[in-house]
From Swiss-Prot:
It comes from Bacillus thuringiensis subsp. konkukian (strain 97-27). Belongs to the CarB family. Residues 133-327, 671-861 form the ATP-grasp domain. Residues 402-546 are annotated as: Oligomerization domain. Gene3D superfamilies: 3.40.50.20, ATP-grasp fold, A domain (3.30.1490.20), ATP-grasp fold, B domain (3.30.470.20), Carbamoyl-phosphate synthetase, large subunit oligomerisation domain (1.10.1030.10), Methylglyoxal synthase-like domain (3.40.50.1380). PANTHER family: CARBAMOYL-PHOSPHATE SYNTHASE [AMMONIA], MITOCHONDRIAL (PTHR11405:SF53), CARBAMOYLTRANSFERASE FAMILY MEMBER (PTHR11405). This is Carbamoyl phosphate synthase large chain. One of its GO terms (biological process) is 'de novo' UMP biosynthetic process. It catalyses: hydrogencarbonate + L-glutamine + 2 ATP + H2O = carbamoyl phosphate + L-glutamate + 2 ADP + phosphate + 2 H(+).
Amino acid sequence: MPKRLDINTILVIGSGPIVIGQAAEFDYSGTQACQSLKEEGYKVILVNSNPATIMTDTATADKVYIEPLTLEFVSRIIRKERPDAILPTLGGQTGLNMAVELAKSGVLEECGVEILGTKLSAIEQAEDRDLFRTLMQELNEPTPPSEIIHNLDEAYGFVKEIGYPVIVRPAFTLGGTGGGICHNEEELIEIVTSGLKHSPVTQCLLEKSIAGCKEIEYEVMRDSNDNAIVVCNMENIDPVGVHTGDSIVVAPSQTLSDREYQMLRNTSLRIIRALGIEGGCNVQLALDPYSFQYYVIEVNPRVSRSSALASKATGYPIAKLAAKIAVGLTLDEIVNPVTQKTYACFEPALDYVVSKIPRWPFDKFESANRTLGTQMKATGEVMSIGRNLEESLLKAVRSLELGIYHLELDHLKELDKETMKKRIIKADDERLFIVAEAIRQGVTKEEINEWCEMDFFFLQKVENIVNMEREVKANVGNMEVLQTAKEMGFSDHYIAAAWNKTEREIYDMRKENNMTPVFKMVDTCAAEFESATPYYYSTYADENESIVTDRKSVVVLGSGPIRIGQGVEFDYATVHSVWAIKEAGYEAIIINNNPETVSTDFSISDKLYFEPLTIEDVMHIIDLEKPEGVIVQFGGQTAINLAAKLEEHGVKILGTSLEDLDRAEDRDKFEAALTKLGIPQPVGKTATTVEQAVAIAEEIGYPVLVRPSYVLGGRAMEIVYRQEELLHYMKNAVKVHADHPVLIDRYMVGKEIEVDAISDGENVFIPGIMEHIERAGVHSGDSIGVYPPQSLSEKLKEQIIEHTIALGKGLNIVGLLNIQFVVFEDQVYVIEVNPRASRTVPFLSKITGVPMANVATKVILGQDLVEQGYGTGYHPEEKEVYVKAPVFSFAKLRSVDTTLGPEMKSTGEVMGKDLTLEKALYKGLVASGINIPTHGSVIITVADKDKEEAMEIAKRFHEIGYNLLATAGTAQSLTEQNIPVQVVNKIDSEDYNLLDIIRQGKAQFVINTLTKGKQPARDGFRIRRESVENGVACLTSLDTTRAILRVLESMTFSAHSMKEITQTKRHEVVHA
């Protein structure tokens, strides 16, 4: 059927900020969809609240709205733009829930707007646990014994009948939010209560646990003519019981017999047909390893995280084709963009193995509960491709950027068998490493299978790796063994350690013996047809398929997996850099390993290499391509960290030189440069021993800010108030020695300012200055940022501009730089300079219209700022106010403290823009998920050092009609100031206490600041966690609280009696 001509304008709903469970994969799918619809001649309007994405670039759609994804704002856009249809299935769970809400509110009917792709009835049938179960019964498809519950009593009834363990799955939620596995009554109460709170329809499905079955996924597509195909099937190495987003996944499935494969394939196609989905859909199934019994777990009637993985694993662009199907085209009419010969109705075939390993944030959150279950915890993932599973797995392991080059972790070597057994049974982020360690220590595959039901096939593959390790160690210098190890994916790093050589020596040894990998193409058809895609992976085989052209090329290093501190912002910069390289006439080559992102879409660059970002893997590509040089500025710390090793290999680093990069990162050199330029910075020194650290802190005076050098996202950074805290930090947070010094600075309590600039060595252009609402000490990525600055005097602004220009020139920056300043006692100090793209580049690029990554890339390639129409100076400020607000995923990570500090904790960001700061803040806060009611109760429990400051805040809450609740200490201070307050019991009280108020939803805000000294902090910690678990806004910074107050005050009309007004006026009578 040809495309529909009765619709012209389509509104695409984006997925909002990056949170655990919904990451960069929707930037990729949304971008593809918008481009796909524009290709077909439709007018595309996009609404999304996330400024860090390619999707929200003005070029992606005809009109882009960066507004909160709430009923209020999306309805307003629909009424204004009057689209003919909306396409919600590419915006993840957020997009689906929005479509349901819009339909129920009547706005779609009122404006005559149709839902494309997946009809509302299909969304509800797939997402509503009750309707889904009924449909499966009609189709005769087995689901685990289950019951829909709406309260705890119903849950008790089901468990009585079926017994433990049971799985709780809340309806209409994302990444298993609020769900889990219950083994006893205590867990049942906790998880069901949480699940009902998180489900927008207060409904959970309780099902008998089928943990231990194989978990299989099918990615399927269907069109309006009922053509349906399987794009890819995937198998989780972890059996059912671990969320698929937290599972290690391989594609295609490795352990299914043909009968099992066809049986599950037929089921998946039957389900997508019954739901009537037009587009992409993900079906999750459980298969009993010992019989042909299977169960349907769930269906996602939309493009998902798995579809992004399937797209990159096969080369088949699911989101692009789903958008075309949504407007009426059929699979047999759409040409496959990869082969450019076959049609989209051909099912892809793979002649390689793909592995996906999740990237968890536990390196950031030491206190987080690392156990994996049905609630997702990973922030991102890596993918790798190999000719065998061992190679594919080992490449994925070294892509994780945890400093791991092999399937082994030193700290696991001490584990005894009993501990290993416990951890393998329970499943955490290190399970595969523990399995390898257990095999090294002689535990049999049978025992391990008994503990965790991981398939023997996968255990055999791990055993193959362990056996190869023994071979390598026993045959030092043997070329045949080296060849076999390389074919299995062993890294030079591992072999060098085993053979007591340097990594460079192994590299040279291989080159002398012509032992280098070849590059194979990902072509969707296992080389059956000729293919046009330049999308490659490395392997040790015979024929090289990557043809080097005679064009001059430039390599851009991507930023690897999404994690806290290094998010989608860096992918945004990478993509813009690639486009600029192409505009400048060079061949653009990208190396990256993240399957979720736009940068790994093969249509972006001239050549895409899907490889780990390690020196060995990057050098293989450089040896083949011989580029003009490598750009490391846009890949975050990942790429910067490779610069020195690349230069040792004789590779040219384009842009800021290695020496100048080092000068910005090395503390002593940086201090010398600032002194020379006459730019003030907080007093600070470098310590290489614990004793030195104590002496420095004494000398400069507490509080001090301590951190290791060379970090991103403020890892292991802390504000320390006294010596015992400093000793605790030195012992637990860092391993200090001469190569890894610790920086100790005077901590200045002042306003933090952030600047992004572009320098060509002569000229320095400043697109924007941003002011942080939270004072210095809260990580810039967790602060609310405001542009243009609202409270900076012209004099201070001039100082900041002068310092930025001086730093750009003085540090010989060529490309981007990001500077953080603190304003203390009317003086500007430099806190740090990052000689690379920062996470604010997308935000400022969108606001100012200066395509920063593009301009910086052209500077790097030799076109100065003046030639590009910019010069030295500050870009004129915009009239509107823009707010960048952080978004956290605390609800997914139990036992993580929500207090803000110098260590970054947010996973994503949103933008609010309007004519006043209050309105922009309101939009930013609402978009970030904070509910802002205009009346209610506030609980105030603050540290002694904050009491004075909190009084003014409490008074303002009282004046706009809020009820104040406080524990005895804070209440006394309020009463002394004549501020009415209701005393509540502390949390250790047996009677009705503060936690009960939070649990019962009787408080709208909780203001709780951290008690220094870390121990009474346990009370504060419980208050903060209880707020998160119950969806109450918990404010740990008084600056953020003030910002919310500004919004509330702007929304509230004052109510004063006439007597109060006349009393105030009386003193103001002027006598003539």
